[in-house]
Amino acid sequence: MPQISQRGTNMPQSPIRKLAPLAARAAERGIHIYHLNIGQPDLPTPTIALDAIRNFKRTVLEYTPSQGFLSYRRKLVDFYAHYNIHTTPEDIIITSGGSEAVLFAFMSTLNPGDEILITEPFYANYLAFAISAGAVIKPITTTINEGFCLPKVEEMEKLITPRTRAIMICNPNNPTGYLYTRREMNQIRDLVKKYDLYLFSDEVYRDFIYTGSPYISAMHLEGIEQNVVLIDSVSKRYSECGIRIGALITKNEQVRQTVMKFCQARLSPPLVGQIAAEASLQSGEDYLRDVYDEYVERRKFLIDSINRIPGVYSPIPMGAFYTVVQLPVDDSEKFCAWCLTDFSYENQTIMMAPASGFYMTPGMGHNEVRLAYVLKKDDLAQAVNVLARALEAYPGKTI
């Protein structure tokens, strides 16, 4: 029988989605599941975007330019200017989601065996994209006990080898909700400059910063303009995960030319998705403010509530809509599966993402989960109550 490729064998399962079959069977048994496992916003997509789809008049669903519609890229220039990110339409490449932007960035800049430093815990699909590019992730370990802040620059510098080609950050961070400080961003800049590395910066959650701290984009950092590749997406900002529209932005012409080869090979980004995304830029600040205010309330409610459960601890996330939570359990992956297979409270249970899947270092995150506060407050209240009941009943509890 023909063999599966080594690349395919090495490809990890998603820690966010691999429990889905267990959830499906629980739902078949009539169990109501509170989904805190995945960053799927429940807030309405802008009406203007939905209207653009409803009023779509074309008679042919044609290919779009491989770089994306020029009209959309021009409007993005104005959008980014509000964040003091100064770019041109030529600097922007529209992708099929932020995920494709990361994949194409890796494929365009990393050779097989090259190393990329990424702060852990990190968005699990980064590992899949690195494997696809033949690259090796070297984790910069951060811990829940220190609030997921970066280690000292000397510790980070020890990880750099002759094979190191890039550093990647997600700011604000998925899965931790951590927001890098000016000092930390300068620390990263100095390493990028000293060793002439690429800096990949996933800034999908820039609109969700809750501390009053300034948003510092990688494109704000002086002296590394040719090293920075910025990743963006409409998925979270406008609750448009399903239209699969992202962007790769860089001042580095050689990188853009190489990325465009991959863009041409996949032909074009989604037609209807670009129409909706372009229309969303007209939704105005009121829409983003309402979304922001809702997440502020959910964040406060969830963190206050779960930190009242005995043995449970979550730092206060500064951005995005996730938090990593420490639980009094022997193994969070077993606990998450048990919640779906062997537990229910008043015919309800909870689905979470085991945090071990967001770490590269073995043993890290073994008693942690990632929660996404993407449910209404009433549902969050029920979910927290169910979690507390589950922890009381779980055979592997540690308190």
Tell where the protein language model's regions lie, with residue ranges.
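PLP-dependent class I/II
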Residues: 2-4, 8-14, 19, 25-34, ...
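Basic nucleic-acid-binding alpha-helical/helix-turn surface characteristic of O6-alkylguanine DNA
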Residues: 59
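Conserved N-terminal alpha-helix of the aminotransferase class I/II PLP-enzyme fold
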Residues: 63-96
